[in-house]
Amino acid sequence: MFQNATDWTPTSTDPRDEQFGGVVEPVPTPSDADDYDAVLVGEPYDGAVIGRRGARDGPSAIRESLAGVKTHHFDAGAVSGVADLGDVVLPDGDVADTQAAVREAAAEVHETAALPVFVGGDNSLSYANVAPLVAADNGAVGVVSVDAHLDCRAVGDRGPTSGTPYRQLFDAGLDALAVVGARHFETTTTYAGFLRDQGGRIVTSDAVAADRDGSLDAAREALDGVDHVYVSVDIDVLDAAYPGASAPTPGGIQPRELFALVEALAASDDRIRGFELVETAPTLDTGGRTVDAAARTIAHFLAGAQ
């Protein structure tokens, strides 16, 4: 079910430069992650992406970048207690087969004592990562999706895509969704109306830029009644200056805003049950800037969660 992770190696030769490459430890099975605070899981798949492909290379590139990031956070201290379960072994087949395999793997990861950190891969796998929490019937589940798009498209003849995960999750029983960083002119009236009909909250990228803390409060308010919270980041929430994504467009948020959002969510809410970062496409990037932003987003989330 999992292809074991390779050993992590720091990029610095100075032993005082404690980096994630010297802290993250590979583990062979989900049960071995119980001794850690968080566990990384790679999902190298982009067969369902609507736009440009390349996200299948995201997990390996993000790991490589994260290995060279120092673990010290000025407020939270040094990040530690992180395992790496490796990549989910994906089947040959259609998107539905892939979602089923990832869902089975994600269910095992959610049963561990460690906080799951899924590294994609395309946005279609958000359904597979969250569905086990919904199916557990152990309380209401809500998602904070930090994304330029709503991803509430109906599943059509093509089957599931990177644009359908939250429609699939609502159909499965998801209780609440807040989309933070959504961009004007990136969705349709139909899908915006669908999300609002479900009681969802849309917080635009303009709102994040004008009042980051207020935007975070709006997202929390939308999830006020749930018992479990899952946080999803689609890297295309960043401005098009960070081009290593399937669908970069102008008007996105800045990395500093993204880092602060995920760190605050992780630090202030004990209902967090998982995190994912999706749609990073290294082959579409310029100078590794998007990959580096993705790696540091994970670092900030881990700092907030500890």
From Swiss-Prot:
Sites binding Mn(2+) 2 sit at 147, 149, 234, 236
Q: Name one GO molecular function term.
A: manganese ion binding
Region annotation Disordered: where it falls in the sequence: 1-36
Query: Catalyses which reaction?
Result: N-formimidoyl-L-glutamate + H2O = formamide + L-glutamate
For whether the record's keyword set contains Ubl conjugation, the answer is no
Compositionally skewed regions (Polar residues) per UniProt: 1-13
Q: What are the names of the required cofactors?
A: Mn(2+)
- Keyword Manganese belongs to the record: yes
Which parts of the chain are coiled coil?
none
EC number of the protein: 3.5.3.8
Q: Which PROSITE patterns match?
A: ARGINASE_2
Annotated cofactor note: Binds 2 manganese ions per subunit.
Family according to the record: Belongs to the arginase family.
The function of this protein is: Catalyzes the conversion of N-formimidoyl-L-glutamate to L-glutamate and formamide.
| UniProt-listed HAMAP family | Formimidoylglutam (MF_00737)
Q: What is this protein called?
A: Formimidoylglutamase
Organism this protein belongs to = Halobacterium salinarum (strain ATCC 700922 / JCM 11081 / NRC-1)
